[in-house]
Curated annotation (Swiss-Prot):
Its job: Stimulates the phosphotransfer from phospho-DegS to DegU. Affects protease and levansucrose production.
Gene for this chain: degQ
Family of the protein in this entry: Belongs to the DegQ family.
Source domain of life: Bacteria
Name by which UniProt lists this protein: Degradation enzyme regulation protein DegQ
Organism encoding this protein: Bacillus licheniformis (strain ATCC 14580 / DSM 13 / JCM 2505 / CCUG 7422 / NBRC 12200 / NCIMB 9375 / NCTC 10341 / NRRL NRS-1264 / Gibson 46)
Amino acid sequence: MEKQQIEELKQLLWRLENEIRETKDSLRKINKSIDQYDKYTYLKTS
């Protein structure tokens, strides 16, 4: 493999890692929001 190809792969992997991290953070926030809504609904109907 050429050095340039290795660098391109490193950049691609770095971007993928960041995108995965951002996606995980977003999913955690969504999950937290759903949990809060569920608690509110439970309290409201109880």
